[in-house]
Structure formats: C-alpha cells, structure tokens
C-alpha cells in the first residue's frame, strides 16, 4: 500500500542506515541523503518502533525496538528536509511515558526544522 502512494516506509532495523545516509557525521550537516533535496518529505514516527522499555504506551509492544536516541537522531536528520511531522500509535491508557517521548520528539523536530530554515 505504501509503495502505491509513493511512501517510503523505513523499518526500525533500517533507521540507523537512514541517519548515516542523511547526515554522515551526525545530525545537522544538511545532506539530502536518501531523497532529493526538492522532494516533499513527511516524517511520521510510529511509537511501535520504539523499544517498550521506553514507550510502553502502544498497542503493539515488541522487544528489541529502537532506542529514543536513535529516533531523536533520525528526526533531527529528516527535519530540515520535511514539510510535516507526527507521532502515531500512542496509547493514552499508559503512564504517559510514550506520550511524553512523543512530545519530546515533536520538540526535536520543531527545533531542527527551524534551525534549517534560518
């Protein structure tokens, strides 16, 4: 379905390669990486990709997920190229840990996007 809609889905195990492709030396160096600089990019983070130790508030907890630092680095790397951002699959019936993490990722997106548009 995603391919039909011209959407690139990055599996959790491929996230580190995307960070490296986008930034090379770390978040913020501005290389276009896996997409063209003029592409319209929308970054959607599914909380299910995170390890449940950090984000228990999700409908599908799977062990061996991503570390929050990896997701933060990916958000920072994509933000300068993105037109929008969201965090999905947050369960509101947990202790608020996943929601707090989602809010912090949103903050990282806003700051990184703003720095790139100066």
Placement of each model-derived feature along the sequence:
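Active-site-proximal loop->helix
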Residues: 1-5
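Catalytic cores of soluble, metal-dependent hydrolases
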Residues: 8-10, 14-118
């Amino acid at each position: 379905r995603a391919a039909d809609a011209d959407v690139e889905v990055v599996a959790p195990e491929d996230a580190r390669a995307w960070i490296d492709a986008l930034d090379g030396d770390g978040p913020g160096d501005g290389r276009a990486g896996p997409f063209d600089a003029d592409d319209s990019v929308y970054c959607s983070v599914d909380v299910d990709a995170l390890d449940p130790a950090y984000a228990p508030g999700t409908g599908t907890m799977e062990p061996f997920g991503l570390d929050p630092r990896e997701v933060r680095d990916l958000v920072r790397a994509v933000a300068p190229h993105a037109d929008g951002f969201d965090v999905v699959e947050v369960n509101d019936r947990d202790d608020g840990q996943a929601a707090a993490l989602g809010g912090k990722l949103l903050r990282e997106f806003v700051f990184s996007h703003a720095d790139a548009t100066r």
